[in-house]
């Protein structure tokens, strides 16, 4: 099911990720969920894709997710 707001995300995602990372997760999940209609693994695929999107912009350091530094 798509998430309309960050408050609708699973509690574990809300606890783990900072707000901007939640935005990335939600947008990627919703896009992937829509793209995989008819796939029996639709929700699982959407969660995997959403985590991959977060990991492109954030890095887990200890128990925290921190924004990756941009290279110029």
Predicted regions and their residues:
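C-terminal alpha-helical interaction appendages
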Residues: 1-72
């Amino acid at each position: 099911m798509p998430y309309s707001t960050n408050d609708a995300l699973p509690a574990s995602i809300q606890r783990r990720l900072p707000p901007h990372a939640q935005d990335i997760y939600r947008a990627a999940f919703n896009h992937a969920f829509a793209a995989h209609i008819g796939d029996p693994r639709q929700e699982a695929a959407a969660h995997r894709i959403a985590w991959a999107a977060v990991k492109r912009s954030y890095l887990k350091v200890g128990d925290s997710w921190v924004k990756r530094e941009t290279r110029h």
